[in-house]
Amino acid sequence: MPLSSVSAAQWRALSMRAAEPNGYYLPEWELAVNASARGRLDAAALGAWRDASTLIGLLPVISMWRAYKIPLPALVSADPYGTLCTPLLDRDMAEEAVTGILQQAPGAHSRRAPPSRTAIICPNGNWR
């Protein structure tokens, strides 16, 4: 799903409940990056919801090809400035959030990447 289509109110609420806060993934910051950072425009969002009104996990991503011109079937952080790419996970539903995010990964990859081989890569190594 396009990052810009995530409800800012749900996103903000998730950032307040996050198991590990991440300033690079606050809605105001990441939406500004999404609108203006060269090579990071129109990012995708891997998200997980408990129900239609409760976002429990969010990871803004782009393809590795768009980010680094490396032709691998991988997704990387949509934030070009930060070294922290820990996803926002609801502290009370982290397992469900991770499961939901990973289930979305094959559908969010580049059209050239086989769905079963899509990877999510975090440069600082704290989530794979």
Residue map of PLM features:
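N-acyltransferase acceptor-side catalytic subdomain
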Residues: 1-128
